[in-house]
Amino acid sequence: MCGIIGLYHPTENVSGEIYDALIQVQHRGQDAAGIATWDNKKLSLHKELGVVTEVFKTSESLGLDGNVGIGHVRYPTAGCSDVSEAQPFYSSNPVNICLAHNGTLTNSDEMKKFLLETHFCQFNTQSDSEVLLNLFAYELSKTKFDVLQSSHVFAALREVYKRCEGGFAVTMIVGGVGLIAFRDANGIRPLVLGKKGDGSFMVASESSALSALGYDFEHDVDPGSAIIISEEGVVEKGVCAESISHSPCLFEFVYFSRPDSVIDSISAVSYTHLTLPTNR
């Protein structure tokens, strides 16, 4: 279990708002925190062990500039409790890519072996999230783009979905494209989209983070689907998985999520009241 955030604003720096959003999902992970931003030219990243207020002493977020950004709070389910495992993870091949992941890849070892055999990358951690990052980067490189477009991202994601098993909800920066969010074909981990009247968008693990920061809930990211918010604020949506079967993790309703969150149109607190036994 981890908490992830993605944010786009038409003109303003998003690092402070990502900081505020990470506070709202802090309950999903206290091991480490990180923020990455993109200003259409440069990617900035800071991550450390600790809770959000320890890693970022103020909401100024250590001068992370950019109108597109992602954030992560970590609860370790794979890898170890070391700063090298803190997210977001970064790759510069074939373009600047930064990824924040909530979930567990059940075939991570198989995918890691496959990638090592391609000689496309090396690995610095034991994290399955680093595997997911490099798998996407590898598939993106295979599109052989001249000018990177959203169609190349969707094509790469379709290949990722063919190969990956397990649960994943992801926010990602792809330089030259924008903010990407996608969710596994079973919808095991939650992911929601919100919007403000000023044209800014937020993606978050829980709807409670949207409402706390004044975003109107748009919809859940559908299982097996991806959303791209371009650097110009244009939203594209696409189905990437060949087969979809909605099977959310029940622990999201009764343990992981805040009671004021709504997951796939179901209130977490209402679900708990319906399922927990009563004393008689």
Predicted regions and their residues:
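A short, hydrophobic C-terminal helix/tail in secreted or cell-surface proteins
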Residues: 275-280
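Conserved short alpha-helical segments that host acidic/polar catalytic motifs at enzyme active sites
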Residues: 1-223, 228-274
